[in-house]
């Protein structure tokens, strides 16, 4: 027998009638199933033994032959073959239909495939198939046209008029003959000519028709096979019928659907034999068509066929579709044997590689192994006795179980398994009771806690499975998080608290200030109680006395040898840094040893510390009242400004919210300060939060500060905060306001978890076939990486960005010229430090985004595997790792609201600008005007600054060894000071000699400023760090006069473009430009000079508040109008997850901006149809039109110079525009930055390469814009590699290649367009995918993981890769080389 695993590809086609008859073992003629008396299948029925095989093993139906020795004989009485009953799972039957029937997949699904081929609409097709209208097949020499539809009356009239000279009929027969008459080659060339004529405006329908025709041509399917003459009957075991206890039968819905088809078919046969009237026959044919439709797809019909309990019957399509369908329920999600589940409890005594397995559970799981050992040890001689012994649980059984379990790993899994660390291998240790014991340090990877969580246990059976569990899945081999390379096994909670207590320092305690010669003496002193754990002491280390504490000595004494002395108070972050450091320096074995020591110590000293918290530990600052009074005064002032009409309602609201956020922040800082001083830093609440063991600053703020601002149901912030804290107690109204946030948190958590899970599923689906397949793709392209900054603050260093990647270019030391980093060399931590030392801030590295491997990626472009901190192995499933790395935090982020209980969080904006570093202002860019005491930026501007790293007065210098403006790196001699000491540079930068100072400064940097910023410093000024250099209004964007003159309104008409609102609270009149768009009206303000000449014009966007009157005089710098920023909403990942979704689905954002298509000069034109036309004149004098909705706030003015890709108005950027205007690389950078931004705000670190893998998959296809001599169709979307391959062939033959442009496709769409139809079908829209695949005769190369899981092969990654399958063990050891 041929091994089922011997195939490498799967092809899907439409089955021809002959093929169906070929599969069949006989025709099903009756609709009976089982005889109710004998309970045996009826002859020729749906369960007939003659067709489908015997129901009893090795026995025919009548019982004449009963034994395996008659195997293969067909009984002469009952015609049943003597065989195994399992054949009833694989033998098919068929039904010969009395009239042809159309297959619902090909005519009903939109777009209708038959409709496209014949070019008729779906409704016309339906009317033909359901016998409502005739269609002309051959017009003969009449006036009728081919494919013309005739109703009953028209048909009779035509027959009377033309007699039999034309051919018209209805039903599936008519469609079948039309399909038979199609000449696909002729049709294809006709359509291609039409496509070329249409050129740019490709008709989607034309493209679809062409694609379908090409698919039929290539696949060898015949169009008429979409109409069925023979119906296959699937094997009976797949649609079983079983007897229930009460004697009734439960049957699969398919049997009911088949019965209806057979009954109607038999009735139609009889009617045809009887030559019944046409109308009756027609009705019966229509009913047959309907019954076959419901058999194939019942849910897709208007009138669904219902069963006895009026629930729709499950048809063949429904059995494939959805979560409960064949693909996802039975093929991708099988249940496995040798598994069990139980509640987990903590096992602090376990080693990192162990887990506790309940003895009863172990006995059940390892039963076959125990039975084998029992028989081998000759305690029993057959399996039955062995089972009895096991049930009696005799001593021998337990002894054998111990032997069996030794070094047999088991897998532990906790649902939801969000990333690969959700399943890890452990060595089992037998424990009493019924709960699984879990090591406390692996909880983080599983996201497990011990409040009733359950875990599943699986037993790997074969030696190779056990070897893989040991080598790859053991918990000690999974110390690092694959998403970012940070440790994922680290202490938390009690352990952290214990170590924090142990390593803290306390003043005035027993034994303070003593000196000790070695660690042992310290431990002796502690045991004799003459020394306190927290006492500050001196200990001799490496021949020198070092100031430390007794506790730290204990901690260091316990650590493995070779780790340098840790002399600080250990919080959770410090511990993680320590673990990382030890991992890099000493490797994993030392870390594993250290982790278990840390766990022991932590628990031990947490117990000794025995901390408790009481109300007296919660200290409310005495200054609280003063802070709140001050806030109330500020708010009164804001209210007063509002009453005078100085600020708008939105600004007032934003300012009030800002005041409370600031007050809360200050109060919290004060409170933390007091807690820190309380009991010399031993206030337990402070210790818990500071160590990171439990609780956060945010939670303590609610206990001892104030609860703060709360959010309304809408997400807006209520401007009156909850001033009380939990210690003081909340008033009734405060409590009531709190409830909404708390409830919302719980509801959100439930909804968002599903969202994040679905995101992960889509990502896995798009990236599942990305595997590292080759070592080097040989690309010369790479991407630029540099430090990510937000102003002064470094968000992500060059090290985080580039470490573990390979360099594209060779980098030399700018001073010595020696090669520091060669091309194609891995960038290690040491190399990065070297590069930073010589001042390299940008690198071009190889990236998955630019990898040119045909399938998957190559080792060099992927770089380092973060879970191992080594270069990635060939065969690593990097696509799935990427999907998990992005999806897993998504699920975590959704849980955020849950813990803080709905307290509003929004960044409070300051209205002052100051920079952290000392700097020199080199220059300014952007429109600005001089006003008294400063410079006012009328639009967005930029400061060009150079930071000052180092300064020394020249009078203190004896000799300068460098020249002005020279670039220096660390370690270069700068000067000799007056004391004769040579000073070396500890910075990278440029020398600047200024007045009486010697400076080292940075390269020029840019700081962007908002419109309306008033700058209070001059160009060239030397500015100390922290000095306020300017102010701006954070809650409104002003439109500012740049010239002096008189105001003149244009198209500002009260009631049309201008709305006057009387504010009910203040009685002031607010003038607001409406955001309704009028065809011809374009509200503007002109400034005219004394001669009435227009010298400036300002376009007013919708919702702008006017600050001037018509005819009023205006000075430079006065505000003409202002735009309020929308009210503050709370920033939560609720904003984050949908944003990530939109980016991955490449949805066009709602509030779109328009980007400049080219670089050039802006020219304002008229408003047409509610859109403003803006032309950009490029350098060749060509005008490029841009249409912008009229109410939008413009970011450019007439005559401005813009660069391609600049935003012309405010709004969100559309990724498709980025691709079109700036190209593929810019789009990749844009998507990467946007997605990272969402995660970074939540404090989640994901390496760029994971997001890169997904973006690479989204940009896999190109769109054909010129066909050349290839077989492509204009406007068709094809895979990049297919495109290059076809072009290569055409060029070799001297033809003209096709031209294509890159496109971006969202993840869902990409998953459905994936090459593998099995993978796409198991994702979504199963029936549609299979319909298209069958027409195209698609071949699945079984390249991805999913398709191999579905058909039961090993997945082609890791050890299952083709590369490793061919490895043979050689017998001959001493063979000649």
Swiss-Prot record:
GO terms for cellular component: DNA-directed RNA polymerase complex
GO annotation terms (biological process): DNA-templated transcription
InterPro entries in the record: DNA-dir_RpoC_beta_prime (IPR045867), DNA-dir_RpoC_beta_prime_bact (IPR012754), RNA_pol_asu (IPR000722), RNA_pol_N (IPR006592), RNA_pol_Rpb1_1 (IPR007080), RNA_pol_Rpb1_3 (IPR007066), RNA_pol_Rpb1_3_sf (IPR042102), RNA_pol_Rpb1_4 (IPR007083)
Cofactor notes: Binds 1 Mg(2+) ion per subunit.
Binding site for Zn(2+) 2: 777, 851, 858, 861
Catalytic activity reported: RNA(n) + a ribonucleoside 5'-triphosphate = RNA(n+1) + diphosphate
TM segment ranges: none
Keyword Nucleotidyltransferase assigned: yes
Job description of the protein: DNA-dependent RNA polymerase catalyzes the transcription of DNA into RNA using the four ribonucleoside triphosphates as substrates.
Similarity remark: Belongs to the RNA polymerase beta' chain family.
Protein name: DNA-directed RNA polymerase subunit beta'
């Amino acid at each position: 027998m041929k091994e089922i695993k011997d195939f490498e590809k799967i092809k899907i086609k439409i089955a021809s009638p002959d093929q169906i008859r070929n599969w069949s073992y006989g025709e099903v003629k009756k609709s009976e199933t089982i005889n109710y008396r004998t309970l045996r299948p009826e002859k020729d029925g749906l369960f007939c033994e003659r067709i489908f095989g015997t129901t009893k093993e090795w026995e025919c139906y009548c019982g004449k032959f009963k034994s395996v020795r008659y195997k293969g004989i067909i009984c002469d009485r009952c015609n049943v073959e003597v065989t195994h009953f399992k054949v009833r799972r694989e033998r098919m039957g068929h039904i010969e239909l009395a009239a042809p029937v159309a297959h619902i997949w090909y005519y009903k699904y939109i777009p209708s495939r038959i409709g496209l081929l014949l070019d008729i609409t779906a409704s016309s097709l339906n009317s033909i198939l359901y016998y409502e209208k005739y269609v002309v097949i051959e017009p003969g020499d009449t006036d009728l046209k081919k494919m013309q539809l005739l109703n009953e009356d028209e048909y009779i009239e035509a027959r009377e008029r033309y007699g039999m000279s034309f051919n018209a009929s209805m039903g599936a027969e008519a469609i079948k003959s039309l399909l038979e008459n199609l000449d696909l080659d002729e049709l294809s060339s006709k359509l291609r000519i039409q496509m070329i004529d249409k050129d740019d405006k490709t008709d989607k329908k034309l493209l679809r028709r062409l694609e379908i025709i090409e698919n039929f041509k290539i696949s060898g399917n015949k169009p008429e096979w979409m109409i069925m003459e023979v119906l296959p009957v699937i094997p009976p075991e797949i649609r079983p019928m079983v007897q229930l206890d009460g004697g009734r039968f439960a049957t699969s819905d398919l049997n009911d659907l088949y019965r209806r088809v057979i009954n109607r078919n038999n009735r139609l046969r009889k009617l045809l034999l009887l030559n019944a009237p046409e109308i009756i026959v027609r009705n019966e044919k229509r009913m047959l068509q309907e019954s076959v439709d419901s058999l194939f797809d019942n849910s897709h019909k208007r009138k669904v066929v219902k069963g006895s309990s009026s629930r729709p019957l499950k048809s063949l399509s429904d059995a494939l579709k959805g979560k409960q369908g064949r693909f996802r329920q039975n093929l991708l999600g099988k249940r496995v044997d040798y598994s069990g589940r139980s509640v987990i409890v903590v096992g602090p005594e376990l080693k990192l590689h162990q887990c506790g397995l309940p003895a009863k559970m172990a006995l059940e799981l390892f039963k076959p192994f125990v039975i084998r050992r029992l028989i081998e040890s000759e305690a029993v001689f057959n399996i039955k006795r062995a089972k009895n012994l096991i049930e009696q649980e005799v001593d021998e059984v337990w002894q054998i179980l111990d032997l069996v379990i030794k070094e047999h790993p088991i897998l532990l899994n906790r649902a939801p398994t969000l990333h690969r660390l959700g399943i890890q291998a452990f060595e089992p240790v037998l424990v009493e009771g019924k709960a699984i014991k879990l090591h406390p340090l692996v909880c983080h990877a599983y996201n497990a806690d011990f409040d009733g969580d359950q875990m599943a246990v699986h037993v790997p059976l074969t030696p190779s499975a056990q070897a893989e569990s040991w080598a790859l899945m053991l918990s000690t081999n999974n110390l690092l998080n694959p998403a970012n390379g940070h440790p994922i096994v680290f202490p938390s909670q009690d352990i952290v608290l214990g170590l924090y207590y142990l390593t803290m320092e306390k003043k005035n305690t027993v034994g303070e200030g003593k000196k000790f010669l070695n660690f042992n003496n310290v431990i002796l002193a502690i045991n004799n109680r003459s020394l306190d754990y927290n006492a500050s002491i001196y200990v001799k280390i490496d021949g020198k006395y070092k100031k430390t504490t007794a506790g730290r000595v204990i901690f260091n004494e316990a650590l493995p040898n070779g780790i340098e002395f840790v002399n600080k108070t250990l919080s959770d972050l410090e511990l993680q840094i320590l673990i990382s450091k030890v991992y890099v320096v000493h490797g994993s074995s030392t870390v594993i040893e250290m982790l278990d020591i840390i766990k022991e110590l932590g628990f031990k000293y947490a117990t000794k510390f025995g901390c408790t918290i009481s109300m007296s530990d919660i200290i409310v600052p005495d200054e609280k009242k003063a802070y709140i009074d001050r806030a109330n005064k500020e708010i009164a002032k804001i209210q007063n400004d509002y009453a005078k009409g100085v600020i708008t309602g939105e600004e007032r609201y934003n300012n009030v919210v800002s005041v409370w956020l600031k007050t809360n922040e200050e109060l919290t800082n004060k409170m933390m300060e007091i807690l820190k001083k309380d009991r010399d830093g031993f206030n337990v609440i402070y210790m818990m939060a500071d160590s990171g063991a439990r609780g956060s600053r945010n939670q303590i703020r609610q206990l001892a500060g104030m609860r703060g601002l709360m959010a309304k149901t809408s997400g807006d912030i209520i401007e009156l905060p909850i001033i009380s804290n939990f210690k003081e107690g909340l008033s009734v109204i405060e409590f009531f306001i709190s409830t909404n946030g708390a409830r919302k948190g719980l509801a959100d958590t439930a909804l968002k978890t599903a969202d994040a899970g679905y995101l992960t599923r889509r990502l896995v689906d798009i990236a599942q076939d990305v595997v590292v397949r080759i070592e080097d793709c040989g690309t010369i392209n790479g991407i630029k990486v540099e430090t990510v900054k937000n102003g002064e603050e470094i968000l992500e260093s060059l090290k985080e960005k580039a470490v573990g990647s390979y360099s594209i270019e060779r980098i030399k030391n700018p001073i010595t010229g020696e090669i520091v980093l060669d091309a194609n060399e891995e960038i290690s931590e040491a190399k990065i430090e070297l590069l930073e030392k010589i001042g390299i801030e940008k690198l071009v590295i190889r990236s998955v985004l630019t990898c040119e491997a045909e399938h998957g990626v190559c080792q060099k472009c992927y770089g380092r595997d973060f879970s191992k901190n080594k270069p990635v192995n060939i065969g690593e499933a990097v696509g799935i790792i990427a999907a998990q790395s992005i999806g897993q935090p998504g699920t975590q982020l959704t849980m955020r609201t849950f813990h803080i209980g709905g307290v509003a969080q929004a960044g409070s904006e300051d209205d002052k600008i100051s920079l952290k570093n000392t700097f020199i202002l080199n220059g300014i860019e952007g429109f600005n005007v001089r006003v008294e005491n400063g410079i006012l930026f009328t639009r967005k501007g930029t400061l060009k600054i150079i930071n000052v790293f180092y300064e020394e007065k020249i009078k203190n210098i004896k000799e300068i060894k460098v020249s002005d403006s020279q670039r220096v790196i660390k370690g270069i001699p700068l000067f000799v000071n007056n004391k004769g000491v040579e000073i070396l540079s500890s910075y990278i930068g440029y020398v600047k000699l200024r007045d009486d100072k010697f400076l080292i400064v940075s390269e020029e940097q840019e700081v962007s400023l908002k419109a309306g910023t008033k700058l209070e410093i001059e160009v060239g000024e030397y500015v100390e760090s922290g000095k306020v250099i300017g102010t701006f209004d954070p809650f409104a964007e002003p439109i500012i006069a740049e010239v002096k003159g008189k105001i003149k309104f244009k198209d500002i008409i009260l009631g049309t473009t201008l709305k006057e609102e009387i504010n009910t609270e203040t009685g002031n009149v607010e003038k607001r430009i409406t955001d309704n768009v009028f065809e011809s009206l374009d509200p503007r303000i002109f400034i005219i000079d004394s001669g009435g000449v227009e010298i400036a014009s300002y376009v007013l966007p919708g919702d702008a508040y006017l600050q001037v009157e018509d005819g009023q005089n205006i000075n430079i710098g006065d505000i003409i109008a202002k735009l309020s920023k929308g009210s503050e909403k709370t920033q939560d990942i609720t904003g984050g997850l949908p944003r990530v979704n939109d980016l991955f689905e490449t949805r066009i954002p709602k509030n779109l901006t328009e980007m400049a298509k080219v670089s050039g000069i802006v020219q304002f034109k008229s408003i047409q149809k509610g859109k403003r036309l803006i032309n950009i004149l490029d350098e060749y004098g060509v005008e490029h039109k841009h249409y912008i909705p009229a109410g939008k706030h413009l970011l450019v003015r007439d005559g401005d110079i813009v660069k391609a890709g600049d935003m012309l108005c405010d709004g969100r950027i559309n990724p498709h525009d980025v691709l079109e205007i700036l190209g593929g690389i810019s789009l990749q950078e844009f998507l990467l930055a946007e997605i990272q931004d969402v995660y970074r705000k939540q404090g989640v670190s994901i390496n760029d390469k994971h997001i890169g893998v997904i973006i690479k998959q989204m940009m896999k296809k190109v769109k054909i814009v010129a066909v050349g001599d290839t077989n492509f169709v204009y406007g068709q979307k094809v895979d990049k590699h297919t495109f290059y391959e076809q072009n290569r062939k055409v060029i070799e033959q001297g033809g003209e290649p096709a031209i294509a442009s890159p496109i971006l496709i969202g993840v869902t769409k990409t998953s459905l367009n994936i090459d593998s139809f099995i993978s796409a079908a198991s994702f979504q829209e199963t029936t549609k995918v299979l319909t298209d695949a069958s027409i195209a005769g698609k071949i699945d190369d079984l390249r991805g993981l999913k398709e191999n899981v579905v058909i039961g092969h090993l997945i082609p990654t890791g050890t299952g890769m083709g590369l490793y399958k061919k490895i043979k063990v050689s017998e001959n050891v001493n063979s000649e080389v």
